[in-house]
Amino acid sequence: MASYKDVKKVVLAYSGGLDTSIILKWLQTELGAEVVTFTADLGQGEELEPARKKAEMLGIKEIYIEDVREEFVRDFVFPMFRANAVYEGVYLLGTSIARPLISKHLIDIARKTGADAIAHGATGKGNDQVRFELSAYALNPDIKIIAPWRDWAFKSRTELLAFAEQHQIPVAKDKKGEAPFSVDANLLHSSSEGKVLEDPAQEAPEYVHMRTISPEAAPDKATVIKVGFRKGDAVSINGVEMSPATLLATLNTYGRDNGIGRLDLVENRFVGMKSRGVYETPGGTILLSAHRAIESITLDRGAAHLKDEIMPRYAELIYYGFWFSPEREMLQALIDKSQEYVEGEVTLKLYKGNVMVIGRESEKSLYSDKLVTFEDDQGAYDQKDAAGFIKLNALRLRTLGKRNLAK
């Protein structure tokens, strides 16, 4: 076990669930530390008052429960979506992007309360331990961090349940009496891991999905919506302006009702192993399609292609936990500059798990129907100019061809 003998007061990222409830008791009994709890309302869709009551039952005096939904979407989700960020081609980073925000608040509360350490419930096998701790160290290089999963004797969720029963800690269970799926949820997404999901050859049971109906059960009639953008961020739906969190929640509803946003993924964790997860990102899936569509008419080709080139690196930085790194901030500045004229409206058709762009318009559009028309363009473009363009671009290819044919 790491040495925590100098730790007197700890701020715990507390959900009220299995891991963090036992960690709370462990911090009290094993370390003798005073515990402060922090619970973030990230839009996970559950009442947070039970977490407060459970913390009080366990003897906690300083309890912080904060609604961070607007901050989450405005300062973390939207900047990420300006980049069209996806990890390994498909994952919209719903869990990854929430971790730096939680760490930020843990550090703030530690400063307010005079705590000398923070603690989290991430396991020693996953990415979240890295994300929490890299963010925390970036914001407070001297903070002590306690990660009980790396130190205590428990090796499984079964042992945790036994400990919880021994200490009379109430823990939710499924109908079979087993611990629930490992679930993470926020306003952007939900993820499920563990139990039958650990076999990547087996289809995930329908009951795993919490945020969406199945595409097969979605309405037979398509839903058409319009999403408005300003400087790269979504600001309205069907002409009605909304706050960032309200807008994402509204897109979630549209996505849920049309079976949009399901993903069954085996991903490469930062720590080196592969893991299987079932993700649901209904609103984010719609938002990504809409954002790429508005960029298609407002971004110059060179800018658009450069964004596509740097996106995998940007997404990887978020996935690995480097949100507060200088390289992520440098890339963000470039991305934000690209969004200066990304404004307008995108029309989308939602149907049985599909998001189809059917229209896009912008006062800043670079699309010119006069240039691309198959009809008389009234002299807007002289097709003879293409001959010289092709000849110059073919120069090196012709030179290479002559050499190769001379063999």
From Swiss-Prot:
PANTHER family: ARGININOSUCCINATE SYNTHASE. Gene3D superfamilies: Argininosuccinate synthetase, chain A, domain 2, HUPs, Single helix bin. Belongs to the argininosuccinate synthase family. Type 1 subfamily. Homotetramer. It catalyses: L-citrulline + L-aspartate + ATP = 2-(N(omega)-L-arginino)succinate + AMP + diphosphate + H(+). ATP binds at residues 13-21, 40, 121. Disulfide bonds: none annotated. It is an enzyme of class 6 (ligase). Keywords: Amino-acid biosynthesis, Arginine biosynthesis, ATP-binding, Cytoplasm, Ligase, Nucleotide-binding. It comes from the Bacteria. L-aspartate binds at residues 123, 127-128. L-citrulline binds at residues 91, 96, 127, 131, 182, 191, 267, 279. Pathway: Amino-acid biosynthesis; L-arginine biosynthesis; L-arginine from L-ornithine and carbamoyl phosphate: step 2/3. GO terms for molecular function: argininosuccinate synthase activity; ATP binding. InterPro entries: Arginosuc_syn_C (IPR048268), Arginosuc_syn_N (IPR048267), Arginosuc_synth (IPR001518), Arginosuc_synth_CS (IPR018223), Arginosuc_synth_type_1_subfam (IPR023434), AS_cat/multimer_dom_body (IPR024074), Rossmann-like_a/b/a_fold (IPR014729). One of its GO terms (biological process) is urea cycle. Signal peptide: none annotated. It is found in: Cytoplasm. Its EC number is 6.3.4.5. GO terms for cellular component: cytoplasm. This is Argininosuccinate synthase. It comes from Rhizobium etli (strain ATCC 51251 / DSM 11541 / JCM 21823 / NBRC 15573 / CFN 42).
